[in-house]
Amino acid sequence: MLTIEKVYDAQKALTGVARKTDAIYAPKLCPGTELYLKTENLQVTGSFKLRGAYYKMTCLSEEERARGVIACSAGNHAQGVALAAQKNGIKAVICLPDGAPISKVEATKSYGAEVCLVEGVYDDAYQKALQLRDEKGYSFLHPFNDVDVIAGQGTIALEILEQLPEVDAVLVPIGGGGLISGIAYTLKTLKPSIKIYGVEAKGAPCMKNALEHGSLEKLPSVSTIADGIAVKQPGDLTYDICSKYVDEIVTVTDDEISAAILALMETQKLVAEGAGAVSVAAALFNKVDLKGKKAVCVVSGGNIDVTILSRVINRGLLMSGRSCELHIELLDRPGQLKGVTQIIADQGGNVTSVRHERASEGSDVNGCCLRIVLETRNFEHIEQIKKALQEKGFKLID
């Protein structure tokens, strides 16, 4: 049973193991709101997951520890379990979906855990972990549907109240619901007036779907850049806690998540993974009313592959009007390309990529299409460049 005493016990157990992460003021992210970021992306292993994993490990019996542990994860729980097992001298086997970022896979191995890659998503890794548990006798460490794990995550709430006792609202990412269950239970127990907002990826709204339907329905599929919260079904324990203590759940798109990752990098010099940035995305795009409030966004993790990061940055630039691609119909004659680039330069745009295609089906046989990528200041700047091109007779293709 989850109790506030258990959360305090977890805090004691984590002393000297998990960092007390900073709550950083972020005035530029959400004007009109006194917004703070709880930087669990700077936690040991790069996410909050060490808290729950380590506390769970301390609650195991000697017999369970001797058998070794097995866990399944989208990546961050894997690292938390691997490091916790290493610190306690326990064998750990981790089942990861084969689409997990390479950085998370390699980090898990670096802590000494045995990694088993499973085809599919988190739920497939979960089934494989249960199979190996039954075959080998390992102790299974659930990533979210476990009282001890939830209590460990709840220690974040104790720190938030210590750092910002006057906080009005807290925004928390949701995957399976372990993080928000621990935070919501603890905050509502100690300060019932606080508003708790859960944030899910639009492509993986398992908790929102379950609460709206009043049952633990399993999503047929999930698709999001926020791999850490790409979960098809919440747990029964997290479902019950969220139904009692969470005020509202909202969703954010992949484009909004990308914009949030970019904003965190530019304004706060922080790197967040997709799952870690959903709370900030909800604040940025006004998914909940935070005007005049003191609010905290839990940035739950920062383990993102640099290859994914580059794609996310490009997506974020497009979302914020800092980049655009124009398709321009040209006559196939000398000087046309020069004319286009000169107009763009005169308007202060910067060309980063050009593709010149000869006549294609449906176009003028004497024409060609120019696909050009620009760096711009904002959406108004893009419209200014488009208008200048059209005034000089160039035709833009939608």
Where are these regions (language model features)?
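PLP-dependent amino-acid enzyme catalytic core
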Residues: M1-D398
